[in-house]
């Protein structure tokens, strides 16, 4: 279930605490603090947020921004206080129209990148809603056709900028024929000055064969997440692959590193998946797999989300469960060398695993899950977790 589907849908872990997870024997863990930030939502904004990014302006002021799923709008809040700052609106049609866009990237309030979900292009917009220019992303310089894409955090793969180049994500491209797995680029490098596009040096790993891609599936088998560290390395996590892939921007060298969770066996793609909507949503929310991989630049660690096998028999709304980050998950902690130094399991139906951000003082994770007893549809709340090294001398 990837982004096109997504956008088409209108601790210290205390064993005695229902708010934390389970403390395990490890070198590091995530400790729940008493700190939280609450963002009050307008009536036309829902908690089914697909794109959410912190942003620091040129004066050093910190904001939390996210896309309104119901309107062509980016909501802007003060990161620390939770106070609403402003909304940035865009036209759907007309000279400055952007149609349907999936996510965004903010360089500054007068330089906002909106990837179109309908065309292979990126709109560069001002805060006023005026269109500055368009970046066409229809094909690479060697003729590979490209797809519209989303720059989102629900499945964490933003637009990245590095040394004057823009890096945009792609999904599996069925237009590439019987070698779709071998030929589909995962990311594409855009030289916006020379207007040259080239594939990034990584393809989809052999999670499925090109033949299997054409068969009935749940739609999330080839989902992946990507983060950029401060060593100019991209790190990829494919949801049905234990391994992560580290690619250097300096020389294109790629390293494959096994990073296994203690809570799940090797992820296995579901055979003969249900084709009815409820059945597919149930299966998607039950199957064990990996999730988002994010980099914490302040503590020089990575967090890899892991979805545990779940039994949802008796539940009623599988779509909601999936949209709110499933039932059970853990977060693996990796050091700079990609060694696993800890893994924290979180309580069921409490946190939204896809709503998170890195702050200077820790990892912020939303507990606005609709099954959480404290749930309020008008409030987006984040709890702060701090990284704890248990065996540090």
Summary of predicted features, one role per range:
Residues 181-195, 242, 319-337, 378-391:
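Beta-propeller blade signature
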Residues 25-50:
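A short helix->beta-strand "capping" segment at the edge of beta-propeller domains
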Residues 127-163, 169-177:
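Asp-box/WD-like beta-propeller blade repeats and closely related beta-sheet repeat scaffolds
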Residues 83-113, 117, 138-150, 346-352:
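Blade-loop segments of beta-propeller domains
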Residues 41-74, 291-294, 301-307:
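Beta-strand-rich domains and repeat architectures in extracellular enzymes and scaffolds
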Residues 95-96, 260-275, 339-359:
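Conserved blade-ending motifs and adjacent loop-strand segments that build the rim/top face
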Residues 50-59, 102-107, 152-163, 217-230, ...:
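Structural signature of eukaryotic scaffold interfaces centered on beta-propeller domains
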Residues 285-334:
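Loop/turn-rich, solvent-exposed surfaces of beta-rich toroidal or solenoidal domains
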